[in-house]
């Protein structure tokens, strides 16, 4: 048990901390990008699909659905930009559905449905969920710090049956 804890202190915990801190940094960059490209109150900011800007939600949603019908299933296809993030269309063969990958510093996945306007709402909801994802990553960092402290304390504890082990080992020898 002691060696496992030492191994976790040296390898696992630092790697996990670095990963979560990278997530937090990426989320902060993406949140800054989104704040640089705000959405007007109860309105649609517009989306660029295949080089054409769409300011109307219905037209943008219909174009997005049309792209799903013609997109290849075997590789991702870059289709435009939304609020400073690149937009890539991908097919998830496991769930048999299309996904939008919104890429900034991090990748934000949106599962697409059959409703044109609903897909645009899903995109916005995914982007509004970034602070929640960042908070979860921060909670994970805090948890890892607690686990590191507990592991350090556990390593300093002597083996409780050390005397019994020594006595029985001596008898066997």
Residue map of PLM features:
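Mid-to-C-terminal oligomerization/interaction "stalk" domains of large proteins
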Residues: 1-6, 66-173
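C-terminal accessory region of SF2 helicases/translocases
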Residues: 1-50
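Sequence-level detector for tyrosine residue identity
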Residues: 12-13, 23, 54, 82, ...
